[in-house]
Amino acid sequence: QPMVDSELGLTAVFNGIIYNYQQLREELHAQGYRFFSTSDTEVLLKAFHRWGKACVEHFKGMFAFAVSDRRTGELVLGRDRLGIKPLYVAQVPGALRFASSLPALLAGGGINTDVDRVALHHYMSFHSVVPAPRTILQGVRKLPPATIRTVCPDGGSEDWTYWEPTFTRDGTRSAGDWAEVRQQERPGERRSHLRVLRPTEE
């Protein structure tokens, strides 16, 4: 779902769903942003313009995206908290390639497709899983979950991990209490998910 917002100087390629995009759209509209579509991709663009890279902290969903900022010349890559949507990257002479699937990334050629032996060890040890940033191919890496990568015009890059799970035990609630809380959350989640299951715009 590529989209260009000439007014903001931003271009985005987006794969995924932002479940709370309607609420964010209303919030951004109230702050003066004008929308020309009903898609969550445009909400991503407006949110990026409003909050910068911290826009991901407002998103609930599964997503991978790239935003090109014409003003700064930066490319910003982002991935959802749990890494549900993939984002593969490959550094080739004079360019950085990215795609949401390996076949798409490899289609242009010129990428080292030798097997990464460390990744192969992980694959065999962790029941068919290769932890980020490695992939089974030496010339391809994947953006880790909950990561924003900023690629500068000179080719340098910087990663920001915007979320990490917490595992602190809450001793004030029993297992039954947690089950009840979870049951109360589900109807709202279902409504949020159903709202984004809409026909794709032509």
Residue map of PLM features:
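Cysteine-centered catalytic environments shared across enzyme families
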Residues: 1-202
